[in-house]
């Protein structure tokens, strides 16, 4: 990793987490040139969740452990992605054309759509995490890396809105960025073997498709992708990936028993 790349990675880490990192000359245009490094931030979140998982699951029941893991993950990113999910839900459920939906997504009030989205996806995340703790705790790492890959996928397939900091990332992201992101995700395969490795491959494919779907939904409802959509992509992708892992395990179990 070159000096410039390391500098921009520090800036990305500072922007997407609450980790106190000194960054001089914070420039979104420059940071966006290395947006694919967000996958490495996914590893940071994943390792953090693994540490929490080992500690809490030793002391508490899985459900309570899952609640605490999700809370501290969201705290580490400053609750920005949940905020994006709430705004995304408000905008999606708003009645009217793209302009009205975008206004609903950007206003400072929380509507019913945002509340329901936040409750539903966080509840699904907690339940899924509690199952994962019972199956294989290493899938926590997969979930966080894939959540960031989902953001990159959404950026790649989406078109940027005019306003907001998210436009810098969406404008720069392309197929090359996504390819690098996928390559950076492949080390996940090294910590699994056999059927579990196939499940991780399914999770990565599911992630890319989820990001594509988020980009298409954003274009239809808002005209493009902004920071709120990217934040929502992170939260929704995590849930979809964890569900795909749980479902794949069940399908493979039935296949093997049959």
UniProtKB/Swiss-Prot annotation:
Its main location: membrane. It is a multi-pass membrane protein. Pfam families: CobS (PF02654). Its EC number is 2.7.8.26. The keyword Transferase applies. Keywords: Cell membrane, Cobalamin biosynthesis, Magnesium, Membrane, Transferase, Transmembrane, Transmembrane helix. The chain crosses the membrane at residues 35-55, 56-76, 113-133, 137-157, 175-195, 198-218, 238-258. Pathway: Cofactor biosynthesis; adenosylcobalamin biosynthesis; adenosylcobalamin from cob(II)yrinate a,c-diamide: step 7/7. It is found in: Cell membrane. One of its GO terms (cellular component) is plasma membrane. It catalyses: alpha-ribazole + adenosylcob(III)inamide-GDP = adenosylcob(III)alamin + GMP + H(+); alpha-ribazole 5'-phosphate + adenosylcob(III)inamide-GDP = adenosylcob(III)alamin 5'-phosphate + GMP + H(+). It is an enzyme of class 2 (transferase). Belongs to the CobS family. PANTHER family: ADENOSYLCOBINAMIDE-GDP RIBAZOLETRANSFERASE. Joins adenosylcobinamide-GDP and alpha-ribazole to generate adenosylcobalamin (Ado-cobalamin). Also synthesizes adenosylcobalamin 5'-phosphate from adenosylcobinamide-GDP and alpha-ribazole 5'-phosphate. This is Adenosylcobinamide-GDP ribazoletransferase. It comes from Methanocaldococcus jannaschii (strain ATCC 43067 / DSM 2661 / JAL-1 / JCM 10045 / NBRC 100440).
């Amino acid at each position: 990793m070159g000096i410039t790349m390391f500098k921009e990675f520090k800036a990305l880490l500072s922007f997407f987490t609450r980790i106190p990192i000194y960054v001089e000359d914070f420039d979104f245009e420059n940071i966006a040139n290395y947006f694919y490094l967000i996958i490495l931030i996914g590893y940071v979140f994943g390792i953090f969740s693994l540490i929490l998982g080992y500690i809490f699951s030793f002391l508490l029941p899985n459900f309570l452990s899952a609640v605490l893991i999700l809370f501290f993950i969201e705290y580490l990113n400053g609750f920005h992605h949940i905020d994006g999910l709430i705004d995304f839900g408000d905008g999606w459920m708003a009645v009217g054309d793209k302009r009205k939906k975008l206004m609903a997504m950007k206003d400072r009030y929380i509507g019913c759509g945002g509340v329901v989205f936040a409750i539903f996806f966080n509840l699904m995340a907690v339940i899924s995490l509690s199952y994962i703790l019972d199956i294989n705790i290493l899938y926590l790492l997969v979930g966080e890396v894939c959540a960031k890959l989902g953001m990159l996928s959404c950026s790649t397939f989406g078109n940027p809105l005019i306003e907001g900091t998210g436009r810098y990332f969406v404008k720069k992201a392309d197929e090359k960025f996504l390819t690098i992101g996928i390559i950076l995700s492949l080390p996940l395969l090294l910590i699994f073997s056999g059927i579990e490795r196939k499940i991780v491959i399914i999770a990565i494919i599911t992630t890319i498709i989820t990001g594509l779907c988020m980009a298409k939904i954003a274009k239809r409802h808002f005209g493009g992708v902004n920071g709120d959509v990217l934040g929502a992509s992170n939260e929704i992708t995590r849930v979809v990936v964890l569900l795909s892992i749980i479902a794949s395990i069940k399908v493979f179990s039935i296949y093997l028993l049959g």
